[in-house]
Amino acid sequence: ADAIVVHKGRLRLLPPSVYAKLAIVVHLSASTKYAADPTFKYQVAEVEDCLRRGADAVSVHVNIGSLTEDRQLQSMAAVADACERAGLPLLAMVYPRGPGIKDHPELNTLLHAASLAVDLGADIVKLPLHGPVTAMKRVIDSCPIPVLAAGGAQVSDHQFGAFVADVM
C-alpha cells in the first residue's frame, strides 16, 4: 500500500512508523446508514486541522443524484479551495447515488462524475467501477486527473488480473 484513508479521530491512534511508511489521507466526509438520508455526506473535519495533524492529502465523498447533492457539491468546492491554499491534494470520491440513479450507473453518468470532480478542483477522483473495460477506459482517458476505481463485481483472482491487465 502507498496510502491509507482514515477519519481524523484515527490519526491519533496511528503509530509513528505509519507516517514514515504511508501517505495519510484524511477523509472529511461521514454519514451512517441510520440517518434520515444516508446519501448525505456531512463534512466532519477541516483541511487546516488535518494538515496540522500530519495529513498528506484529504478526501471528500459526494453522492451525485442524491437529494442533497447541492450541499455536498458546495462543501467539496470549499474543501478544494482550502486544499489549494494549504497545498494538500484532494481526492474526490464521487458516486452516482440517489432517487434517479440505477444500481449500476451508466457510462455518461460516470463521465459526468469525473468531469465534475475536475471542475470543482479535485486532484484525484474515485469512481465506482462500471461495465466492460472499454467503458472504464473511456472514463479514464477522458479525465485529466488520475482515476481510482472502487468496487466492481465479485470475480475470481484470474478474472480480476485479466481485467487489470486490460485497463492498464
Model regions and ranges:
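Alpha/beta enzyme core
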Residues: 1-5, 9-149, 154-168
